[in-house]
């Protein structure tokens, strides 16, 4: 693999599939991805455009805080992660299950 492919797969970790993300796909043409913690909007946009061969309109990125958990009176927390909402230009679509 060349370095550009490694960078793309380093930025995009996995698609997030949930009821909310499915609804966003149908209504607004928005796809949700889990991305690396140091990825920027520009990195995410370039990775999606190169990997799926589509045109990206808007990228919104946010940090998701890990949940607090306890097990046998010991406190702990799950690690946080970074989420990206990617809106495609009208007429474009991604088959997330097939490509990733």
From Swiss-Prot:
PANTHER family: 60S RIBOSOMAL PROTEIN L23A
Matching Pfam families: Ribosomal_L23
SUPFAM superfamilies, A to Z: Ribosomal proteins S24e, L23 and L15e (SSF54189)
Xref: HAMAP family: Ribosomal_uL23_B (MF_01369_B)
Native species: Xylella fastidiosa (strain 9a5c)
Keyword Protein biosynthesis in record: no
Protein name stated in the entry: Large ribosomal subunit protein uL23
Gene Ontology cellular component annotations, sorted alphabetically: ribonucleoprotein complex; ribosome
């Amino acid at each position: 693999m060349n370095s550009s492919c490694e960078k793309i797969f380093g930025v995009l970790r996995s698609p997030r599939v949930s009821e909310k993300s499915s609804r966003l796909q149908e209504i607004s043409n928005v796809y949700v991805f889990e991305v690396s913690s140091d990825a920027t909007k520009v990195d995410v946009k370039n990775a999606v455009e190169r990997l799926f061969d589509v045109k990206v309109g808007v990228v919104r990125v946010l940090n998701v805080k890990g949940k607090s958990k306890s097990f046998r009176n010991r406190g702990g927390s799950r690690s946080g992660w970074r989420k990206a909402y990617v809106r495609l230009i009208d007429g474009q679509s991604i088959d997330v299950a097939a490509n990733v």
